[in-house]
Design a protein with these regions (language model features):
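Glycine-rich, proline-tolerant flexible connector loops at the mouths of alpha/beta enzymes
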Residues: 28-29, 37-55
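Hydrophobic faces of well-ordered beta-strands that scaffold small-molecule active sites
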Residues: 16-20, 40-42, 68-71, 91-93
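Catalytic cores of alpha/beta
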Residues: 77-89, 100-101
């Protein structure tokens, strides 16, 4: 899978994103990609969006060539792994207030390659 946002950031290019809170249509990824955005921020913390809708939007966004990034509702391993399994290419945890919490959250998502 191509992560357009990551590629642009690593190349020092401008990378534009847009936040999504109210829209529930899978077409939003295509609309935002056509509008010139590189990534889509899907917010599961500040609305009633569930994993099914976030997943559908993430998959459709990838298909449209836009990177889906999801903010999960809380510090829970299963929230992060589920959105990644369902198509998100990045996860944002809310209310990370210190380095120890950040390290713990990173450890949730670190993969050991066998």
């Amino acid at each position: 899978m191509k992560n357009i946002a990551k590629e642009k950031i690593l190349n020092g290019e401008l990378c534009l994103g847009v936040g999504l809170r109210q829209s529930r249509t899978v077409d939003i990824g295509k609309i935002m990609a056509t509008s010139g955005y590189d990534w889509l921020f899907i917010d599961m913390e500040h609305n009633s969006m569930d994993i099914d809708i976030a997943s559908q939007i993430s998959v459709a966004a990838q298909d449209a060539g836009i990177t889906p990034i999801v903010r999960v509702p809380e510090f829970a391993h299963h929230h992060a792994t589920r959105v990644l399994d369902c198509g998100a290419m990045g996860v944002v945890f809310p209310h990370v207030e210190n380095a120890d919490i950040a390290k713990k959250l990173v450890s949730y998502l670190s993969l050991i390659h066998i």
